A protein has these predicted regions:
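Short coil/turn linker and secondary-structure boundary residues
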Residues: 2, 10-13, 77, 91-93
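Short amphipathic alpha-helical segments that mediate assembly, nucleic-acid/protein binding
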Residues: 14-15, 79-82, 106
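Amphipathic, interaction-prone secondary-structure segments
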Residues: 20-59
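Mixed-charge, Lys/Arg-enriched low-complexity segments
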Residues: 83-116
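Hydrophobic, Leu/Ile/Phe/Ala-enriched alpha-helical segments that form helix-helix packing faces
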Residues: 18-25, 86-90
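Acidic, low-complexity, intrinsically disordered interaction modules
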Residues: 43-90
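Negatively charged, low-complexity tracts enriched in Asp/Glu with abundant Ser/Thr
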Residues: 3-23
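Charged, low-complexity surface segments at secondary-structure and domain boundaries
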Residues: 1-8, 66-72
Length: 116
């Protein structure tokens, strides 16, 4: 397995970073969003807590791309940049899931999984 962690300070730079690391032979299998609206973006550089994960395969090789500075469920640039990445990856999603807190659980997390 290969882990690629994108830790950009501004969410709008994440799509450029994602484009830079992706390869044409990667097949997207799943996207997971796990964003804590009560805490926000994790301050520590702990990739396992990054709110965005895209899981690709190249043959039998699993590639997990994690992105730190993307947000969901509130106004601002983060959700718009998250939507741009989902569009770039060809993910079908409900815009309300990204731009509103309708999917927010009692623990404050918005958890979304998209299978490809």
């Amino acid at each position: 397995m290969i882990n690629i962690n994108i830790f950009e300070a501004a969410s709008y730079t994440n799509i450029s970073a994602l484009k830079a690391v992706m390869h044409d032979n990667w097949i997207l299998k799943e996207v997971r969003i796990d964003y804590n609206t009560l805490i926000g973006i994790p301050l520590e550089n702990m990739p396992e807590k990054f709110p965005f994960k895209a899981i690709f395969y190249s043959g039998d090789l699993k590639i997990e791309v994690r992105i730190c500075s993307l947000t969901a469920g509130y106004p601002g640039t983060g959700p718009h940049d998250l939507a741009k990445i989902l569009d770039f990856l060809g993910i079908q999603y409900d815009k309300e899931d990204i731009f509103t807190q309708k999917k927010r659980g009692e623990d404050g997390f918005i958890r979304l999984t998209y299978k490809c």
